[in-house]
From Swiss-Prot:
GO terms for molecular function: angiotensin receptor binding. This is Arrestin red cell isoform 3. GO terms for cellular component: cytoplasm. Belongs to the arrestin family. Signal peptide: none annotated. It comes from Oncorhynchus mykiss. It is found in: Cytoplasm. The keyword Cytoplasm applies. PROSITE patterns: ARRESTINS. The keyword Cell division does not apply. SUPFAM superfamilies: E set domains (SSF81296). InterPro entries: Arrestin, Arrestin-like_C, Arrestin-like_N, Arrestin_C-like, Arrestin_CS, Arrestin_N, Ig_E-set. The lineage of its organism: Eukaryota, Metazoa, Chordata, Craniata, Vertebrata. Keywords: Cytoplasm, Sensory transduction. GO terms for biological process: G protein-coupled receptor internalization; nervous system development; positive regulation of ERK1 and ERK2 cascade; signal transduction.
Length: 415
């Protein structure tokens, strides 16, 4: 009997402990044709609720400036999407079939618990954080999704932070099941005062890489020119397209190798170089795109963005892509060579993502659940109940991610 694993449920309470939100997960997957539904339960103290209503909002926002610069009513933030759900009293038109997890939570928490539902539009961006500099304070720039729950007589009522629950969830994408073709590119360059050319061919061993996986770059040079290749530079670059009022692109090297391999005239050269882009070696780079919130144990370089529809760029937020750049540094010769002759380079696009988990939580409608057992004390929300009934077997976990070892706690309590 004893070591049965319970269903993990994340919870967060308002500072005044009168409102608590329960969610089965923090990451919601964009499958390109649909996004996982956001379905949770909100528990409200009836003495605190009185004659008010219970609201839950979902907001997707793009913060493009430091929070400490928000002055004189100017905010460096753009809300890309806002949706409001009235959990109590329920509106008949908004009611949906409860998921199995919601039914189990409602049974466990009692009559003061109410379900809520959100459908995330497919065209919204994934959660991305731009890495702040050492001196930056406040919320980091980037795209995030926030759930906010509170009691009020109307949705327009101003709510104090102490009386509301605010928590951040993530919209994520996983690697496609069928990767694209193997990247390969080639170029030929002719030089001044040389009747023969230099040919560069570069390829990757595959198109899709997982975070932390080494990237093998195959470089083949056929140098029939009179020039000498002095050395090679291979780098992995992250490109972040910021889609706001206009589109701007930022690039940042996340891994690089410089080799003193020379290719003399009338010779060939072939070698495989290995690079591994990771966040560990890039923590000081301001503006680097990362997955989700900063200072969390599960943070890494931002995954590549897969977009199905790019017609409305204003709601795309931040689009992340990666390329490997191979550069041949050519020897200079003659008075005009420095002006007319340039180094030879090519770029290879690839995809960097997390693999799809073997088992993803699925929210399934549940029409009927046995209601013979009485609801247990709602104060008992920190431990697994001794009942071994499947409908009662929960493990509640505070809605906060684990911190990186050796790093200061994140003072933002919205996570």
């Amino acid at each position: 009997m004893g070591d049965k694993a319970g269903t993990r449920v994340f919870k967060k309470s308002s500072p005044n402990c009168k409102v608590t939100v329960y969610l089965g997960k923090r990451d919601f997957v964009d499958h390109l044709d649909q996004v996982d539904p956001v379905d949770g339960v909100i528990l409200v103290d009836p003495e605190y609720l009185k004659d008010r209503k219970v609201f839950v909002t979902l907001t997707c926002a793009f913060r493009y400036g430091r929070e400490d610069l928000d002055v004189l009513g100017l905010s460096f933030r753009k809300d890309l999407y806002i949706s409001t759900f009235q959990a109590f009293p329920p509106i008949a038109e908004e009611r949906k079939a409860n998921s199995r997890l919601q039914e189990r939570l409602l049974k466990k928490l009692g009559q003061q618990a109410h379900p809520f539902y959100f459908t995330i539009p497919q065209n919204l961006p994934c959660s991305v954080t731009l890495q702040p500099g050492p001196e930056d304070t406040g919320k980091a720039c980037g795209v995030d999704f926030e759930i906010r729950a509170f009691c009020a007589k109307s949705i327009e009522e101003k709510i104090h932070k102490r009386n509301s629950v605010r928590l951040v969830i993530r919209k994520v994408q996983y690697a496609p099941e069928k990767p694209g073709p193997q990247p390969m590119v080639e170029t030929t360059r002719s030089f001044l005062m040389s009747d023969r050319s230099l040919h560069l061919e570069a390829s990757l061993d595959k198109e899709l890489y997982y975070h932390g996986e080494p990237i093998s770059v195959n470089v083949h040079v056929t140098n029939n020119s009179t020039k000498t290749v002095k050395r090679l530079k291979i780098s992995v670059r992250q490109y972040a397209d910021i889609c706001l009022f206009s589109t701007a692109q930022y690039k940042c090297p996340v891994a690089q190798v410089e080799a003193d391999d020379q290719v003399s005239s009338s010779s060939t050269f072939c070698k495989v170089y290995t690079l591994t882009p990771t966040l560990d070696k890039n923590r000081e780079k301001r503006g680097l795109a990362l997955d989700g919130k900063l200072k969390h144990e599960d943070t890494n370089l931002a995954s590549s963005t897969i977009v199905k529809d790019v017609t409305n760029k204003e709601v795309l937020g931040i689009l992340v892509s990666y390329r490997v750049k191979v550069k041949l540094v050519i020897s200079r010769g003659g008075l005009l060579s420095g002006v007319l002759e340039r180094d030879v380079s090519v770029e290879l696009p690839f995809v960097l993502m997390h693999p799809k988990p073997t088992e993803l939580p699925i929210s399934r409608p549940q029409s009927a659940v046995p209601d013979s057992d009485p609801p247990i004390d709602t104060n008992l929300i920190e431990f697994e109940t001794n009942s071994f009934s499947q409908d009662d077997d929960f493990v509640f976990e505070d809605f906060a991610r684990l911190r990186l070892k050796g790093m200061a706690d994140d003072k933002d309590d919205d996570c």
